[in-house]
Amino acid sequence: MSDSKYQEFSKKYVRSGRDVIVPKEKNPFKQMKFDTFRLENSPDFGGLGGHVDWGYICDPVNMFPDAAVSESARHLTILGGNPVNYLELHGEVEITLGHNRDDLHVFRFNESVSVYVEKGMFYNINVTKIDSPARPIHYNELVYGDIIPEAAEVAGEDIGEGYRKYLKSGKVLHAVNQPHHEVIYPVIYVGSPMFGAAEPIRRTWMPVSEPHTLANKAHYHKYLEYIVFYGTNPDDPLDLGGIVEFTIGENEDDLTVFTIDKSTQFFVKPGLWHSPMVFSEIRDRNKPIIFCEVSYAPGFGGPDQTVWIDGISPYPPAPPEN
């Protein structure tokens, strides 16, 4: 690939540097004392609208004391600040949900939790305790854009504590069946089907602590996804903490390897060849590189949705989602 074509390709499919950072001065809450890492689904980068944020909450904060109305459907995921085990919250959080102000319900958690907030629902996040400043809470927000299909209401009946259908916590978030056995730390998975929601949005957080290769050969999907690599240094979200070599290309005979040492996002449109992804250097196994996949597609995970360059999947069939 020529230099000019490489630059054109990069502009189309790759984002890094200050383009993916929300400066801490622009964070909505002063308790978020570090820059936030943002994936913007802009017209020239996927075109879905909406955004995904990865940030840190350093001190207790009551975000919306009067409960805010969600103008778009969104997923909010609150993880512990230790990437070696995101499941351990090392703090406490209260989540308020309701379909109107006269019917608000408060749920308390001392373990990591994900919440699905329907469009028009009232909600609040109140972080009441953080055990240690060295372990700020890792806060992730996925906000739907106008182009992403809105889901129907989450399935289920509001009986007793029925709003719990919008909340998943603790070991439920642990992707125990993920096929990458080289990844020794818990992998986090959050998907709309977990909540009974109709729209096919899924995310994974995979902490990679040792040099090795994930997805060892090129393939493409029939759905849209973003491949995100970010570091776990709150002081500098652009610090990847190592080196990743990621292969990507518009046809199988013209693949290019991008070598990155900064937190970087890749837009992978349907049919775009990608992988292998080689984690060639990890500076500190206690500060792993996070491989995060954000997927938008019907039928995600089905064997007919992925095409491998040699026609053979290296992974066993995935178990059905519950």
Regions inferred by a protein language model and the residue ranges of each:
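Extended, hydrophobic interaction surfaces within ordered domains
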Residues: 53, 112-120, 135-143, 202-204
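Short, flexible loop/turn elements at secondary-structure junctions
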Residues: 79-81, 121, 230-232, 264, ...
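Short acidic (Asp/Glu) patches
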Residues: 59-62, 97-102, 119-121, 211-213, ...
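A short, N-terminal "cap"/entry segment at the start of jelly-roll beta-barrel domains
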Residues: 1-67, 151-218
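Double-stranded beta-helix
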Residues: 2-18, 22, 126-175, 238, ...
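A short beta-strand-loop-beta hairpin characteristic of the jelly-roll/cupin
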Residues: 78-110, 229-261
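Extended extracellular/luminal ectodomain segments enriched in beta-structured repeat modules
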Residues: 71-74, 222-225
